[in-house]
C-alpha cells in the first residue's frame, strides 16, 4: 500500500525575510551600566524615531522593561535635550555613528547599539570598557563549535550592501 501525503503537512518551516519580521530586537548597551537592554527596531521607521527613543532610554536606563514598553515618540513627555552619542556595531564588528548608513542597510546589519555620554572624549577608553560587554555577548552568538550564527546568513545581506 502506498502512503498518501497529508495535504496539510508543510514541506518545511516557513521562512520570513529579515525585513518583514514583526519584531527585530537589538541589544542596547549604556556606557557604565553592567547590563544591556533590548529595543525593537520594527516599531521605528527612521533614525529620528530611533534616536529619540534611545536618548530617552539613556536618561531612564534603570527603568524596568515594563515601564519602557511602548517608549516611542511621545511628544507629551517634552523635548529631550541630552548629550549622548549613539553608536552601533554591524555584523562584522565595525562601529559606526548612528545615521552613517541608509536606514534600510542599518536595520539589516545592526548587531549592537551603544549609548555613550558625549563628554566621553577618548573612544579607545570607551572601547576597552565595552570589550568586556562585547566579549560576553559574542559568546552568546556562537554555537557549540564556536561559529557565529550570522556567517551562514551573509548571503541574504550581500546583494543589498553592494
Curated annotation (Swiss-Prot):
Its main location: nucleus. Keywords: Auxin signaling pathway, Nucleus, Repressor, Transcription, Transcription regulation. Residues 23-118 form the PB1 domain. The keyword DNA-binding does not apply. InterPro entries: AUX/IAA_dom (IPR033389), AUX_IAA (IPR003311), PB1-like (IPR053793). One of its GO terms (cellular component) is nucleus. Lacks the EAR-like motif (domain I) which is conserved in the Aux/IAA family. Homodimers and heterodimers. Belongs to the Aux/IAA family. This is Putative auxin-responsive protein IAA28. It comes from Oryza sativa subsp. japonica (Rice). The gene is IAA28.
Amino acid at each position: 500500500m502506498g502512503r498518501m501525503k497529508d495535504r496539510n503537512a508543510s514541506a518545511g518551516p516557513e521562512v520570513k525575510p529579515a525585513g518583514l519580521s514583526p519584531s527585530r530586537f537589538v541589544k542596547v548597551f549604556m556606557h557604565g551600566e553592567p547590563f544591556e537592554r533590548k529595543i525593537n527596531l520594527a516599531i521605528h521607521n527612521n533614525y529620528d524615531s530611533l534616536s529619540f527613543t534611545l536618548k530617552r532610554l539613556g536618561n531612564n536606563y534603570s527603568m524596568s522593561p515594563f515601564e519602557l514598553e511602548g517608549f516611542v515618540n511621545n511628544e507629551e513627555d517634552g523635548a529631550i535635550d541630552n548629550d549622548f552619542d549613539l553608536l552601533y556595531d554591524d555584523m562584522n564588528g565595525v562601529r559606526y555613528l548612528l545615521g552613517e548608513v541608509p536606514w534600510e542597510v542599518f536595520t539589516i546589519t545592526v548587531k549592537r547599539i551603544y549609548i555613550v555620554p558625549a563628554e566621553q572624549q577618548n573612544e579607545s577608553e570607551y572601547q576597552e570598557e565595552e570589550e568586556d560587554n562585547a566579549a560576553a555577548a559574542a559568546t552568546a552568538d556562537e554555537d557549540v563549535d564556536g561559529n557565529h550564527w550570522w556567517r551562514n546568513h551573509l548571503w541574504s545581506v550581500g546583494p543589498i550592501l553592494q
